[in-house]
Amino acid sequence: MNHPIAPAPVAFRPLDRAPGELTALVELLRAAPARPVHLDGFLSEEQARALGETVRALPDWESSAVVWNEDRTATRKVTPQEWRDSSPERRAAIRDVARNIPALFDTGSAYPAEHRERLSDFFVFAGMGPDLRERLARWTEPGVPLTTNVEFARYGPGDRLGEHSDAESDTLFVLNLYLDPDYREDDGGVLGFRDEEGRDFLMPPRFNSLSVMPIRSGCVHWVTPWQSDRTGRYTVSIAAVPVSATPGEVK
């Protein structure tokens, strides 16, 4: 389904949250056992639709497929065909990831100017602009400077993420902003999170909702298979990491 491009204000700014939601966010890294947070209506409807159109227009997507090694202690990249040929228990993850983002801003880029401007505005926000920096400071201990890694992903039929933890990384938490306006409940692609005590939380990728997920030892997360016959579940993932950490791919 095509959606008209809506103009967005220059500055991306999340909508104000209810007191209970703010409390849950402040406790995100301190709660024991861990608790993810799922917020509907993260941006204004106008900004979410405009950003979604810009992300869907990204021209360069690459299938990112990985399989587990024999002892399931690490993964390695493979081709999509190798992933399909692997046994089900070896299939760690497969979905499309946007590549060559910097080239979109080169002189002569075919990426439409309005999308370039909107994407640039979003990077100001997601790349530790003042609004996001102030919000993240509420969720972390004083004196812990953070930076962010941003990834754009989409899912085709059957794409999924297997159960894993990312606890070996330096990531403190991940924000996932879902930008598929055509998402329906039976499309699948649900983010699952299991805490240290074995309790599961399910977060459907509803349009303009945001999942905020702590990354810690003893917790795992996954994405259920994408059931739709169309490409969808367009997602912006923002991983918050200490400034000394080495950037890595957002899972």
Where are these regions (language model features)?
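Short, conserved, surface-exposed binding loops centered on an aromatic residue
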Residues: 138-144, 164-169
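Hydrophobic alpha-helical segments and helix-packing faces
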Residues: 125-129, 148, 168
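Short, charged/polar N-terminal "headpieces" of proteins
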Residues: 20-21
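Phosphate/oxyanion-binding loops and surfaces in catalytic or ligand/nucleic-acid-binding neighborhoods
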Residues: 57-61, 139, 182, 243
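Non-heme Fe(II)/2-oxoglutarate
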Residues: 3-17, 26-135
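A short coil-to-beta-strand element that immediately follows conserved catalytic motifs
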Residues: 142-151, 187
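Catalytic core of Fe(II)/2-oxoglutarate
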Residues: 2-13, 153-171, 179-251
